């Protein structure tokens, strides 16, 4: 049955507060056991979610807040950077031989810094120089970044833009978008990183893990965010600096095309070996959209060949790849780069909001991946971030690139040491959106 468009979908504020406080104050369900090494990531999601909800002051006492800050610093390594969880902390037993099993970690460092910012720390105890030097060591010859350093300084980890996003995010937190050596510390090779992003851009504007791979909204989001942090997004007038997103109109079209009416598993049918499966039509997915119900009453009338005027869709999901089902997390991975590029307005937020609130919002709070799924920390946080970007009443404004509130970002930008560092070169403390209304969607 289609949604009643006259009935406003409701964000269950109280349930979300309870959900996130439970995640903060109690043991997580056993399903999270295999993610013990990701505690720093979960910590950021939980604390930032409470901040977005405006509940952080009420959820934490001053003593608890300080305790979490100390917990994060306990994960800082002697040589700089952070471990992603206490599990690899050897304490006094750590030595030159076994420290390879307790390495500096890209995600651990990025999320540790963000937690400290959300909690109002001044980052004075962060080994900033050591972290910035480490970033130059984990940059690969092609310009991308790894996850950690292995034996003999070999860069290890994936090859996609997630690590570039976190590396440039760390760099922006600690030194802004200044280029070149700062305070005697060398910089990463920004031009080479931009080349790496450009090489992963596809013919249709999407961005993939690596050249000639399948486009993916998550990689597009991370790449656009990294270009945002390095002030290398496209600008109306070339300024001589190498910039990414070389086909802006194509990228916007690809992102906007991730809107879908395939909202759950029952909306698709397997066509493998049926009459539609021929040499001309065969592909790897073997599925077509099947709507059990229509997105609106007017849509059903239109399908039955009855004349209708333009109608508003009831629910619209967002997927991350072509021919995939709508997924809560991809609402963030698509809307976030659109906002950073200055084009969030090219999608209709209303049916996306209804999809999130009517279909994936859970009765106990949080969001599931798909309709009917239990809520989890990852999807619940990203769903909340999307609603904040949409201006949901009762939610704090979010900084889409950093995944924290605008309040937390202002705290970072107010820190005296950072203002002094950036002022030394006359740099601005904030990265502004350089794209504006650079491109028209007509002809896309």
Describe each region flagged by the PLM:
Residues 1-444:
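Preference for long, amphipathic alpha-helical scaffolds in soluble/luminal domains
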């Amino acid at each position: 049955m289609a949604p009643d468009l006259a009935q406003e979908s409701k964000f269950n504020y109280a349930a979300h507060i309870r959900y996130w406080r439970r995640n903060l104050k109690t043991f997580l369900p056993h399903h999270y056991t295999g993610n013990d090494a990701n505690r720093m990531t979960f910590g950021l999601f939980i604390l930032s979610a409470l901040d977005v909800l405006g509940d952080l002051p009420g959820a934490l006492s001053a003593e608890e807040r300080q305790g979490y800050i100390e917990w994060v610093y306990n994960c800082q390594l002697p040589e700089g950077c952070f471990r992603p969880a206490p599990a690899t902390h050897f304490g006094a037993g750590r030595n030159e031989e076994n420290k390879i099993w307790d390495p500096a970690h890209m995600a651990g460092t990025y999320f540790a810094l963000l937690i400290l910012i959300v909690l109002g720390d001044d980052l004075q105890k962060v080994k900033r120089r050591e972290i910035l030097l480490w970033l130059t060591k984990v940059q690969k010859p092609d310009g991308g970044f790894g996850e950690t350093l292995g034996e003999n300084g070999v860069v290890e980890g994936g090859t996609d833009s997630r690590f570039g996003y976190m590396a440039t995010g760390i760099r922006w937190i600690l030194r802004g978008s200044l280029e070149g050596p700062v305070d005697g510390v060398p910089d990463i090779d920004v031009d080479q990183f931009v080349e790496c992003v450009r090489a992963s851009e596809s013919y249709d504007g999407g961005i993939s893990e690596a050249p000639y791979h399948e486009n993916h909204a998550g990689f597009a989001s991370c790449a656009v965010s990294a270009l945002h942090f390095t002030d290398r997004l496209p600008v109306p007038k070339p300024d001589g600096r190498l910039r990414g997103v070389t086909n802006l109109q194509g990228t916007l079209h690809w992102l906007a095309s991730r809107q879908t009416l395939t909202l759950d598993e029952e909306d698709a049918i397997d066509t493998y070996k049926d009459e539609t499966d021929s040499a001309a039509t065969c592909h790897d997915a073997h599925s077509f959209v099947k709507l059990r119900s229509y997105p609106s009453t007017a849509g059903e009338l239109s399908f039955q060949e009855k004349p209708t005027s333009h109608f508003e869709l009831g629910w619209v999901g967002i997927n991350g790849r072509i021919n995939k089902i709508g997924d809560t997390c991809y609402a963030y991975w698509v809307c976030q780069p659109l906002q950073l590029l200055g084009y969030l307005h090219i999608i209709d937020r209303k049916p996306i909001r209804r999809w999130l609130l009517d279909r994936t919002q859970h009765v106990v709070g949080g969001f599931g991946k798909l309709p009917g799924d239990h809520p989890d920390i990852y999807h619940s946080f990203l769903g909340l971030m999307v609603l904040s970007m949409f201006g949901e009443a009762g939610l704090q404004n979010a900084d889409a690139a950093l995944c924290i509130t605008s309040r937390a970002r202002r705290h970072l930008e107010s820190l005296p040491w950072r203002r002094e560092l950036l002022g030394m070169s006359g740099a601005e403390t904030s990265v502004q959106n350089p794209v504006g209304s650079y491109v028209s969607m007509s002809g896309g």
